[in-house]
Every structure is written in C-alpha cells, then in structure tokens.
Amino acid sequence: MDIRNEILKLKKEKGAIILAHYYQIPEIQEIADYVGDSYYLSKIAKDCEENIIVFCGVKFMAESAKILSPEKTVILPVMEAGCVMADMATADGLAKLKEEHPNAKVVCYINSSTEVKALSDVCCTSSNAENIINNLEEKEIIFLPDRNLGSYIQEKTPDKKFILWNGFCIVHEAIQKEEILRLKSEHEGILTVAHPECSKEIRDISDFIGSTSEIINFVNNSSNKKFIIITEEGVLHQLRKNGEEKEFYIPYGKMVCRNMKMTTLKDLYESLLKMENKIEIDEDLRLKAYNSLKNMHKLGG
C-alpha cells in the first residue's frame, strides 16, 4: 500500500484539510496542505472552507482550531501529543494570580490549555505577542506560561509591568550558552538565529530572534551561508528546501520535541480512515476560551 497516495485519496473523499506545524517530521510537512507556525495555522483553521481539519501538531493547537471553528470536525492524529510547557500552567493557579492582580490583563501564549485560555483576556503567539501587548491599554500584564517569551516581550515593551508565570519549553530551555559559543568559534562568520522561547543568555548572544516563520524568512532572505538554528530541528526541512547552498548547525546536533515528532504517516492515515481522535470541548468552556483567541486575531495584526 502506498500510504501517501491513500492519505491523499481519503483526504479528497472526505473533503478534509491537513495542517502541519514546522516541527512535524518531513513526511508530514510534505503531505500537508498548509505548513506553518501556530498563528498562521490558527488563521487557516478559522478561515478554511473544509469541514474536517486534521491537525498534525500537539493538542493545544487542535483545541485552538476547535475553539475557533466549533462547527468543524477537528482531528488530532495522536491524542498523546501534548505540550510540557502548556501543562505547566494551571487554571487554578491562574485564578489565584488574577485575584492577586485584579487590574492586570491576562495574556496567555497559545501554548496553553483550553482551561487557561478561558481565564485569559487575550491569547498570543511568538510572532504577534509584541503587537498584542502594545495594543493593550493596561500597564500590568500577567503573562503565561513561558517565562522566556514573556521576558523577551517585556524587554520590547518597557512601559509595561509583567507578572511572569514560571513555565518554559524543555527543548529550548536545555540549550547552554557554552554550546553556542563553541559553534561560533568553530565557524567564522556564522549567524545565530534563536526562538524567543530560549533563555535570556541565549537571546543575548544571538544575531536574530524570531518565531519559526520569522526564522525561516530571515534565513531565506539572508546572504549569509552559515547559521546556528536554535529551535526545534523540524524547521530545517523548510530551510533546506529553500537554501540548498546554506549550512545549518543545531546545538548539540539535536533539538527534538518528542511530542511534535509523534505523528507519523500511518497515524495520519488511520485518523482519516476511522475519523477518530476528534477534539471535543464543552461549549461553555469553549465560549470563554474563544474570547481570548478572538482578541488575538483582533489585536495581533
């Protein structure tokens, strides 16, 4: 059986659309209708005509698609594909923080559970967080769950006071300054490109900081030939497609999000064939979470 052709056949029969994040395995990226970062994919999910969305990513992404389009069937091929950082933020903890800071606006990274989104004023991604914070009148901001993205945006918006949740991405947090300095010393003229989920000490020695889509755009438009890429290595698939003459180096030779790498072509095929692993969200909860995502699209540009 040619599983790729079978997937395309099932997709056509069912009128489905396949979305994939940049961190997915190359085979999934290649068969997807759209590949992108969280913000781009959330817009596609909201605006697409198809009534069946197969989201090759992690759970919070598929949940966001369902929140935005409750009338559509949203399928996550591997239900176990979660996000460690998203799990670090709890609704109970956020409710307590809101009581302690009643005048603060709550901005949650899209890498959050539906329950956290429901208690937040606005959602954001790494590509639109600065715009959103600047568009808020309030000076006090509760930002969760990523302390690294939060501190990065805090540097960009010094007129705001941030209360940061103590969460982080285990993949980006693991990178040490010494490894980046080693790579720099071994490759003269190399540019360092980092995701804002990296720690401040990594951001401070980087030449460019941006979301996955911003990293790809920066590298594609750069005349430089060598890059240290400090984000999940799935982005290398797109970078190599667009810059065959360029050299890319990943810290320690490996930056892997195991949850993002769970989804295989077989999983995608099985989910389309059986129409299983549908995302279901309580309507009252969905409506509360919807406001934060609606405000993201309104304020994020």
Swiss-Prot record:
Residue sites binding [4Fe-4S] cluster per the record: 83, 169, 257
Cofactor note text: Binds 1 [4Fe-4S] cluster per subunit.
Chief location bin: cytoplasm
Any GO MF annotation of the entry: 4 iron, 4 sulfur cluster binding
Reported cofactor(s): [4Fe-4S] cluster
Enzyme class: transferase
One Gene Ontology term from the biological process aspect of the record: 'de novo' NAD biosynthetic process from L-aspartate
Binding positions (iminosuccinate): 21, 38, 109-111, 126, 195-197, 212
Localization in the cell: Cytoplasm
Keywords: 4Fe-4S, Cytoplasm, Iron, Iron-sulfur, Metal-binding, Pyridine nucleotide biosynthesis, Transferase
Enzyme Commission designation: 2.5.1.72
Catalytic reaction equation(s): iminosuccinate + dihydroxyacetone phosphate = quinolinate + phosphate + 2 H2O + H(+)
Record-linked Pfam families: NadA
Known pathway: Cofactor biosynthesis; NAD(+) biosynthesis; quinolinate from iminoaspartate: step 1/1
UniProt GO cellular component terms: cytosol
Role, per record: Catalyzes the condensation of iminoaspartate with dihydroxyacetone phosphate to form quinolinate.
Family: Belongs to the quinolinate synthase family. Type 2 subfamily.
Name used for this protein in its record: Quinolinate synthase
Gene name linked to the record: nadA
